[in-house]
């Protein structure tokens, strides 16, 4: 009887993540209820975020991309802002990997992490979030947490049209009062996050 009770508690306490590419939103769920909803920027066309059922494979607070970043010259000026690691680097220059803080890998090289949200899908396949949301997701998930990615990535014009709509697929009234804290309510529009002080891809 005790084992059954523990199993029920475990199921009820299960944390999961849903990523809606159409709405450009990520949802943190506990017991099937949304406890936190974050705007995102997923993979752009040519680098679309793959849909499917995954699990968190790795967590790393100070992760850097091994494939993407920028190239600077000997004076530190940016030569290529959106560079691949195998691009030619000018003499005296260097390749600087893109920072991906609070990284939660869930599919190959793709994961959720803190990053710049320009207001439309813009990444190389990862799911960017405003930093305060990435921290909350990072602290709530574990290796093995289910991640479901669904929906169709909108074109830029269509997405910007949707951003004026009050419709969201999920009810975003927070079931967990901790996430109703004003610290998780950014002082900017829900679809846009300003660039942080550090450079982001």
Spans of model-derived segments:
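Cell wall/extracellular polymer interaction/catalysis modules
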Residues: 8-84, 89-93, 101
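Bacterial N-terminal signal peptides
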Residues: 1-6
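Exported/periplasmic cell-wall-interacting domains
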Residues: 47-51, 70-201
């Amino acid at each position: 009887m005790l084992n059954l009770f523990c199993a029920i508690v475990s199921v009820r306490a299960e944390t999961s993540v849903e990523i809606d590419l159409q709405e450009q939103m990520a949802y943190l769920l506990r017991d099937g209820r949304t406890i936190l909803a974050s705007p995102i920027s997923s993979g752009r066309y040519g680098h679309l975020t793959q849909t499917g059922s995954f699990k968190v494979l790795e967590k790393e607070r100070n992760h850097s991309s091994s494939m993407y970043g920028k190239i600077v010259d000997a004076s530190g000026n940016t030569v290529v802002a959106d560079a691949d690691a195998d691009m030619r680097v000018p003499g005296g220059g260097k390749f600087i990997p893109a920072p991906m803080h609070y990284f939660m890998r869930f599919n190959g090289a793709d994961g959720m992490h803190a990053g710049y949200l320009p207001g439309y899908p813009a990444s190389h396949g990862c799911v960017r979030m405003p930093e305060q949301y990435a921290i909350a997701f990072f602290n709530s998930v574990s290796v093995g947490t289910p991640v479901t990615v669904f929906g169709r990535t909108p074109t830029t014009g269509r997405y910007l049209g949707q951003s004026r709509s009050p419709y969201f697929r999920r009810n975003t009234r927070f079931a967990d009062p901790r996430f109703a804290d004003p610290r998780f309510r950014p002082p900017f529009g829900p679809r846009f996050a300003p660039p942080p002080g550090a450079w982001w891809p």
